[in-house]
C-alpha cells in the first residue's frame, strides 16, 4: 500500500519542509488546558459561545473546548486578509458570517494567531456592534513586535517571534494544518527569503 497511512507518516512526509519546531504538541496541550481552566473560572455559571475564525482556528477551538468545563455553543466565521501570501494584507473580507444572533450572549472569539492585529480589530468591532453581553479573545499564538493596533487580549497561549509559522491549524497554501505542533518552514518551502 502506498501513501500516507498514519499521522507519523504525514509528519515525516512534510519533514523536509520544516525548519524547526517552535512549540511541541505537549506544550500546546498543556497551555490549552491552562487556558481552559481560566476560561471555566472566569465564566463560571454561564453559557459561552465560542466563535472560531476559519480555517486556522478550528484545531485550536476543538482542543480548547475539551478543556472548558461549561455549557458551550459553537459558531464560525471565515475571513480573509492573507490570500496566498505569508503576510496579512490588512484588507479584511468576511467570507462566512455567523449563524447565531450575538445579542446578550457571552462570546469568546477563538483565533489561531494574532499578527498585525488588523483583522482582529475589524472582527472585534464587527462583533461588538451585534451587542453581545461580553466579548473576549482567546488566541493560541501572538507574534511579538508587529502589532499595528493595540489590542487587549484576555487569553493568550504563546508569544512567538515574527516568523511565518505552520501547523496546528496554521497553513501555507492549505498545507501543514494538521501537523500536531507549530513550526517554521524552510524558506525554499514557501518562496521566502
Task: Tell where the protein language model's regions lie, with residue ranges.
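PRPP-associated nucleotide enzymes
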Residues: 1-193
Amino acid at each position: 500500500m502506498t501513501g500516507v497511512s498514519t499521522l507519523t507518516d504525514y509528519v515525516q512526509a512534510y519533514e523536509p519542509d520544516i525548519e524547526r519546531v517552535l512549540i511541541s504538541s505537549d506544550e500546546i496541550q498543556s497551555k490549552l488546558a491552562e487556558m481552559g481552566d481560566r476560561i471555566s473560572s472566569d465564566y463560571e455559571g454561564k453559557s459561552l459561545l465560542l466563535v472560531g475564525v476559519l480555517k486556522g482556528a478550528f484545531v485550536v477551538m476543538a482542543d480548547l473546548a475539551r478543556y472548558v468545563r461549561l455549557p458551550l455553543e459553537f459558531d464560525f466565521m471565515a475571513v480573509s486578509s492573507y490570500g496566498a501570501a505569508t503576510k496579512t494584507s490588512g484588507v479584511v473580507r468576511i467570507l462566512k458570517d455567523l449563524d447565531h444572533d450575538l445579542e446578550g450572549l457571552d462570546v469568546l472569539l477563538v483565533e489561531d494567531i494574532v499578527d498585525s492585529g488588523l483583522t482582529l480589530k475589524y472582527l472585534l468591532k464587527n462583533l461588538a456592534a451585534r451587542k453581545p453581553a461580553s466579548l473576549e479573545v482567546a488566541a493560541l499564538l501572538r507574534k511579538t513586535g508587529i502589532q499595528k493596533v493595540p489590542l487587549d487580549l484576555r487569553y493568550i497561549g504563546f508569544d512567538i517571534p515574527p516568523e511565518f509559522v505552520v501547523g496546528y491549524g496554521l497553513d501555507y497554501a492549505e498545507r501543514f494544518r494538521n501537523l500536531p505542533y507549530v513550526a517554521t518552514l524552510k524558506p525554499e518551502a514557501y518562496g521566502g527569503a
